[in-house]
């Protein structure tokens, strides 16, 4: 088969792929059909067919690859966990992964707010700084509030995951996964607007 969006596969240092695929198609439960295994990049039949760009950027040197697996064979010792345990392993990793990614998004929003504040106090129009024009101070204040709310939700998700385990944390992780990305998109968009044309250039 083929897999797209294999992040980091284009890096020369990438020696192994962590592959999840169906190994038990006859299992009664769909969640028991997948397994996870290590596949060396130099295994016969493993081919990078193309690198995928994102908005025109190739994200070199790591990049995102499309990989073809043609009759690839590996030893049973490359299996991670047990046969059919792949979905369980992946789900266990995704909980902490989602918390991590949301915290990174909060960091990006924090940086965007920092730039927004700097721009609003250093750029003058009509004899006044931008912070004193058109309700911009409200935009900044709302961004600060939304970041703090999202941060608390992420911290709650992390605490619940650490203290009570994944199953108890699933609900708050799901909430966080909705709230945090939307917050980050809103704050970053406001920062772009505050910078005008500069906001979509490499200067910012």
Label every model-predicted segment.
Residues 2-49:
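A short core secondary-structure module
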Residues 3, 10, 23, 43, ...:
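A broadly conserved detector of short glycine/acidic/proline-rich loop/turn motifs that flank catalytic sites
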Residues 8-11, 29, 56-61, 94-104:
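Short alpha-helix boundary/capping segments
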Residues 15, 63, 174:
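Exposed loop/turn and edge beta-strand positions of beta-sandwich/beta-sheet ligand-binding modules
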Residues 42-73:
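Flexible, small-/acidic-enriched active-site or ligand-binding loops
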Residues 47-48, 78-83:
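Cytochrome P450 core scaffold surrounding the K-helix E-X-X-R motif
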Residues 56, 77-80, 127-128:
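Short beta-strand/turn micro-motifs at beta-sheet edges
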Residues 66-71, 82-87, 91-204:
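Alpha-helical interface subdomain recognition
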């Amino acid at each position: 088969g083929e897999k797209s969006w294999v992040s980091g596969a284009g890096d020369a240092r990438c020696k192994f792929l962590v592959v999840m695929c169906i190994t038990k198609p006859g299992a009664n439960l769909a969640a028991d059909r997948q397994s996870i295994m290590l596949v060396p990049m130099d295994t016969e039949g493993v081919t990078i067919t193309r690198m995928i760009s994102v908005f025109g950027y190739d994200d070199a040197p790591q990049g995102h690859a499309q990989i073809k697996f043609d009759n690839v064979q590996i030893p049973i010792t490359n299996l991670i966990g047990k046969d059919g345990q792949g979905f369980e392993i992946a789900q266990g990793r995704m909980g902490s992964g989602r918390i991590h990614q949301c915290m990174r998004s909060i960091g990006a929003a924090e940086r965007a707010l920092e730039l927004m504040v700097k721009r609003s106090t250093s750029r003058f129009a009509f004899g006044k700084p931008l912070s004193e024009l058109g309700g911009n101070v409200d935009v900044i204040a709302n961004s600060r509030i939304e970041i703090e709310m999202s941060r608390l939700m992420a911290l709650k998700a992390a605490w619940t995951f650490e203290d009570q385990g994944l199953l108890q944390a699933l609900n708050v992780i799901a909430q966080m996964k909705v709230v945090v990305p939307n917050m980050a998109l809103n704050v970053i968009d406001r920062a772009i607007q505050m910078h005008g044309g500069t906001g979509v250039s490499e200067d910012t």
